[in-house]
């Protein structure tokens, strides 16, 4: 990898199986681990996420929760809100903006996620949430957010710093779930499953890079479109973000069934330059699966390649982490083939420098 050791991104290694068929190809994850095994394993074990100040709500339970964050820090909120949609007793909303909803108040739990601690949108949203009376917990490696926690006595989870935020997903996501579990918004079963997920990913690692390259063969040089069931949108966003940042690709994502009411019409101009990656899980709605099958025929009629990607594992949590790994490694393999540094984010750096000149 250009620019140094790819382990700086601490990515998981992916494997999956290619079905020998000309119809939509199915990729099922089988083995997965990451180079920094001990770091990932520690990050996925409950109560071992990072250095955490006591998080005790003393019986208080929020009526709603906001997870404030952007990019690699904010993806944990997008995924947690979807993963817990059918399990949390109150709404959990991912908030990726400078502002917060008007309903934010003293019954709101605001979880501020900023890896650097200096993300301006997150800090602005946090200020608005505090003024509205929200109760705050922070997840950060330090920076201004860490200073605010020290100043105001807010509980926080301090995660290791010095790496790209997207590479610290294991720490950030499990920290978010740790906070939500403490607030009684994340069920014990999901929370405890992280430990077995770590063991599963470490134990299953044969043929991983070879399999990742097989998927890259199918998408290299193509315009990538990502689709999933709406319940898996957080996962699909993670794939898009990793392809954007690591592989420097423009790609899009949409979800079923909503795309059936708009984007599907746009497929009248689809062609062989497109490749469709459809993420499927056993948890998908049965009617959504039917919609996917019909739409795959439409995509193929327009000349697009269609690949169905499935996760490996005996439960939803294992399959989820497996699919995260598939997307992460796909982005790194594509970056390597293109001679790109997956860590480099020149356009984002340019934007930040320009914004720093304007109060």
Set out the residue ranges of the language-model regions.
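Extreme N-terminal basic, low-complexity initiation segments
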Residues: 1-9
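Leucine-biased recognition of intrinsically disordered, low-complexity hydrophobic segments
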Residues: 9, 17-18
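C-terminal active-site/capping subdomain that shapes the small-molecule cofactor and substrate pocket
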Residues: 265, 272-346
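Short, small/acidic-rich helices and loops at N termini and domain boundaries
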Residues: 343-359
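A generic structural motif
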Residues: 94-96, 249-260, 305-314
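Glycine-rich phosphate-binding loops that contact phosphosugars or nucleotide phosphates
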Residues: 13-14, 56-202, 279-286, 290-307
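Active-site phosphate/pyrophosphate-binding segments
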Residues: 23-38, 45-55, 60-63, 179-275, ...
């Amino acid at each position: 990898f250009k620019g140094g050791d790819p382990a700086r991104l601490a990515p998981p290694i992916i494997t999956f199986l290619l079905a020998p068929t000309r119809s939509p190809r199915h990729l099922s994850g089988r083995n997965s681990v990451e180079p920094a095994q001990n770091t990932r394993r520690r990050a996925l074990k409950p109560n071992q996420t990072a250095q955490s100040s006591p998080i005790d709500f003393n019986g208080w339970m929020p009526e709603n929760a906001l997870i404030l964050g952007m990019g690699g820090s904010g993806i944990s909120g997008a995924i947690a809100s979807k993963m817990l949609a059918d399990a949390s007793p109150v709404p959990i909303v991912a908030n990726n903006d400078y502002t917060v909803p008007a309903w934010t108040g003293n019954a709101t739990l605001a979880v501020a996620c900023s890896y650097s601690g200096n993300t301006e949108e997150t800090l602005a949203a946090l200020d608005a949430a505090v003024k509205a009376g929200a109760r705050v917990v922070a997840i950060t490696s330090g920076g201004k957010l860490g200073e605010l926690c020290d100043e105001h006595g807010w509980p926080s989870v301090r995660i290791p710093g010095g790496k790209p935020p997207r590479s610290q997903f294991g720490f950030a996501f499990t920290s978010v779930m740790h906070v939500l579990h403490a607030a009684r918004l994340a069920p014990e079963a999901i929370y405890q499953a992280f430990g077995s997920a770590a063991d599963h990913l470490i134990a299953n690692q044969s043929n991983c890079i070879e399999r990742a390259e097989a998927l890259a063969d199918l998408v290299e040089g193509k315009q990538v479109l990502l689709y999933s069931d709406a319940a898996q949108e957080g996962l699909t966003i993670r794939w898009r973000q990793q392809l954007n940042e690591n592989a420097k690709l423009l790609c899009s994502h949409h979800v079923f069934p909503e795309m059936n009411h708009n984007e599907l019409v746009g497929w009248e101009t689809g062609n062989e330059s497109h490749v469709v990656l459809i993420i499927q899980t056993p948890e998908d709605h049965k009617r959504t699966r039917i919609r996917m099958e019909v739409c795959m025929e439409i995509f193929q009629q327009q000349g697009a390649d269609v690949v169905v990607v499935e996760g490996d594992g005996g439960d939803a949590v294992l399959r989820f982490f497996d699919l995260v790994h598939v997307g992460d490694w796909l982005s790194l393999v594509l970056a390597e083939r293109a001679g790109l540094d997956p860590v480099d984010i020149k356009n984002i750096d340019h934007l930040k420098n320009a914004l720093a000149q304007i109060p």
